[in-house]
Swiss-Prot record:
Function per UniProt: Transcription repressor.
Region (Disordered) residue spans: 253-279, 486-508
SMART domains (alphabetical): G_patch (SM00443)
Name of the featured protein: Zinc finger CCCH-type with G patch domain-containing protein
Organism of origin: Drosophila virilis (Fruit fly)
Basic residues: bias regions: 499-508
UniProt key word DNA-binding: yes
């Protein structure tokens, strides 16, 4: 703006001095343009100032409205927080009266099952929660009095106030947090229910309560003999005092008058007990199946050697509760494949062995003895195949006799076989023919003894039809082998007789 005014002043001074008409016209046009430009600039600045003032006024109004809204929201939050605090105080007052009381609290197991157990209320949480129905509630901290699993077992150091770990790092329980609405009445143990086959929980030395069944009860000495469930207990039958037992509640049918109805009631109670045990077994089976789905599957399945047997090992393991795809042990976490033995090179350091393994692309089974045995087995198999091919190409006296005696075909084939037989037998010396004759005679005597034993077995086992059939086929094959040996002996004797005749003719 100032520059434009300075230029306009210079143009007016030039007009006063200039006398040339053409220059004056140009200066007058330039002055008109500058005056128009100054007028437009002044009008735009005035509009900008007005818009700025209007915008500032609008921003102030918006800021005032936001400030008022924030004040109202703060007042509402303060009111809500006061209401929540009042509700929390009411719930804390209500549940603080239950501190130290016994109750029945829910516990969710790792496989998803939910069950109620007796517990002791030891604290109230400071935070409000919303239950399933949208009602405000607080959580209570409870310690289970009859823990059946490791995660339910209370920490002794926590009870004494000396535990060095927090709730997430400690292996034992510092108290489970359960909603106050989920708390139920305490189930007091009723020892009058103790009877034979009654399901109970028994406390062992690991402070866990294990399931079992009552064998006998002594109410005078308040002792009970219990058979514990599961295979992990070495002594399944033990004596427990009543203080270390907790009878499980079993729904019973109404009492009936007749004896037959009482018998039906007993059967119904046993069925309920069995259904209870079936539920536990079903939960264990579900956990094992879940474990098999999320467990790394090895390349070799358990019992792979049974492809050569009838699978009796797998049948026995299945009858004992083993689930295919899981590991060994009661919890299904044991190894399936044996630990591979490693044989390191003799006289080499561990660093040198590691360098060898790294040179083999980090193969973990580089020094495995199983791999070496399989490699040696493949080499031996290849050597056996080569030896078999080599032996099959060789033609000895027995192979020649078998081919000549058992071979069948046209007359031309027989003539060629006879010619080959004569030629091959003539190639052998008298000594080799005598040796083969002795061997064949021994085989004939041995085969005759086998035939005699088979005939005795047939006579002794005349009742068993399957054995008779198998022995008959065996006897028939032995007779065929005997006939083959006798034919070979006849051929050898003919060759020897021919040579003797020729010798006599030459001597004559």
């Amino acid at each position: 703006m100032d520059e434009y005014e300075a230029q306009l002043l210079v143009v007016e001074q030039a007009l006063l001095v200039t006398t040339d008409a053409q220059q004056r016209e140009e200066l007058i046009a330039l002055r008109a343009n500058l005056e128009e430009l100054l007028a437009l600039t002044r009008s735009s600045e005035t509009e900008d100032i007005n818009e700025t003032n209007t915008q500032q006024a609008t921003d102030i109004d918006d800021e005032l409205k936001r400030f008022q809204n924030e004040l109202s929201s703060l007042e509402g939050e303060q009111t809500d927080s006061q209401d929540d605090q009042q509700r929390l105080e009411e719930l804390r007052t209500k549940y603080n009266a239950l501190l130290g009381e016994k109750c029945s609290a829910p516990h969710e197991h790792s496989w998803g099952a939910l069950s109620y157990h007796n517990a002791l209320i030891c604290g109230v949480d400071d935070e409000l929660i919303l239950d399933k129905n949208g009602i405000l509630d607080v959580r209570l901290r409870v310690l289970f009095t009859n823990p059946t699993h490791r995660e339910m077992l209370p920490c002794n150091y926590y009870l004494e106030g000396e535990c060095r770990f927090d709730e997430t790092r400690c292996r034992y329980s510092h108290g489970a947090l359960v909603p106050g609405a989920a708390i139920k009445d305490y189930n007091a143990p009723d020892f009058c229910r103790l009877a034979r086959n009654c399901p109970v929980l028994a406390k062992l030395q690991d402070r866990l309560w294990h399931r079992g069944r009552v064998l006998c009860v002594n109410f005078m000495e308040q002792q009970c003999r219990v058979r514990l469930d599961g295979q992990e207990h070495k002594e399944r039958e033990r004596d427990f005092p009543f203080e270390e037992l907790f009878p499980l509640i079993v729904e019973e049918d109404d009492e009936l008058s007749s004896d037959s109805e009482e018998t039906n009631e007993t059967d119904g109670s046993d069925a309920a007990n069995e259904s209870d045990m079936d539920d536990v077994e079903a939960a264990r089976q579900a956990r094992m199946v879940e474990l098999s789905l999320f467990t790394f599957k090895p390349n070799e399945r358990l019992g792979a050697w049974e492809q050569y047997t009838r699978g009796i090992g797998s049948k026995l393991m299945a009858s004992m509760g083993y689930i295919h795809g899981t590991g060994l042990g009661s919890d299904g976490r044991g190894i399936v494949t044996p630990v591979s033995a490693q044989i390191l090179p003799q006289g080499r350091s561990l660093d040198a062995c590691m360098e060898l393994r790294e040179a083999a692309n980090g193969d973990k089974d580089y020094f495995s003895i199983e791999r070496k045995l399989k490699r040696a087995q493949r080499r031996q198999q290849a050597a056996n195949e080569k030896a078999y091919e080599r032996e099959s190409k060789r033609t000895d006296v027995f192979a020649f006799l078998n081919g000549s005696v058992l071979g069948q075909g046209s007359q031309r084939a027989e003539n060629s076989t006879k010619t080959t037989k004569i030629d091959n037998l003539q190639q052998h010396t008298n000594k080799s023919l005598n040796v083969e004759t002795v061997r064949i005679a021994d085989d004939i005597r041995r085969k005759q003894r086998d035939i005699a034993k088979t005939q005795q077995s047939l006579a002794r086992n005349a009742i068993d039809s399957q054995l008779q059939k198998r022995l008959s086929s065996q006897l028939q094959s032995q007779k065929q082998e005997l006939a083959t040996l006798q034919a070979q002996e006849s051929s050898l004797s003919k060759e020897q007789q021919t040579r003797k005749s020729k010798n006599k003719m030459f001597e004559f």
